[in-house]
């Protein structure tokens, strides 16, 4: 993942270096809201998937964005962080006091400071879908038709599928 302008770069979900001036050298799961102390953006680096999402462990629910990754390469999540400062924003910006995240997507560009222009009379078309989902946890793949989870543990494989309502 990287930040605005690709100035800071980190492995994801386990960060092992410095990202947003925070030392994660011990190996920290920065996909978990509670582990991120400062306001932070995560932008996906060359994702080969057609989805991006956010999952709330406490609520057992999440939101997915689905679009062709060749047309919609931009995948970003923003959080105010889990510090006292971030939790104050959570309280101000949510109905039930957080956590607050922004899921952002981009058509034709992979980073927020990048711009793609339309010429006079030019037209570009695309489709994108936002899907709420629940009870699956973090998923491995999604399309406009279904959300899929497959997880390997010492006891074997487990999984789940949630079809869309279209």
Where are these regions (language model features)?
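Residues at beta-strand starts and edge strands
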Residues: 122-126, 155-157
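Acidic, contiguous internal or C-terminal segments within carbohydrate-active enzymes
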Residues: 1, 128, 150
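A general sequence property marking short-to-moderate contiguous segments
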Residues: 124-139
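Surface beta-strand/loop "capping" patches
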Residues: 135-165
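A contiguous, surface-exposed recognition patch within enzymatic or periplasmic domains that forms
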Residues: 1-123, 131
């Amino acid at each position: 993942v990287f930040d605005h302008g690709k100035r800071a770069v980190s492995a994801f979900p386990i960060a092992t270096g410095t990202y947003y001036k925070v030392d994660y050298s011990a190996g920290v799961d920065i996909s978990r809201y509670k582990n991120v102390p400062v306001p932070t953006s995560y932008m996906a680096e060359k994702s080969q998937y057609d989805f991006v999402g956010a999952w709330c462990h406490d609520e057992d629910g999440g939101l997915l964005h689905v679009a062709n990754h060749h047309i919609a390469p931009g995948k970003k999540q923003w959080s105010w962080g889990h510090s006292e400062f971030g939790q104050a924003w959570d309280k101000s910006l949510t109905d039930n006091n957080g956590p607050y995240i922004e899921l952002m997507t981009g058509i034709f560009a992979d980073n927020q400071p990048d711009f793609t222009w339309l010429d006079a009379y030019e037209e570009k078309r695309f489709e994108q879908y936002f899907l709420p989902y629940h009870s699956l946890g973090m998923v491995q793949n999604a399309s406009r038709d279904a959300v899929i989870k497959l997880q390997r543990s010492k006891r074997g494989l487990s999984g789940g599928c949630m079809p869309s309502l279209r």
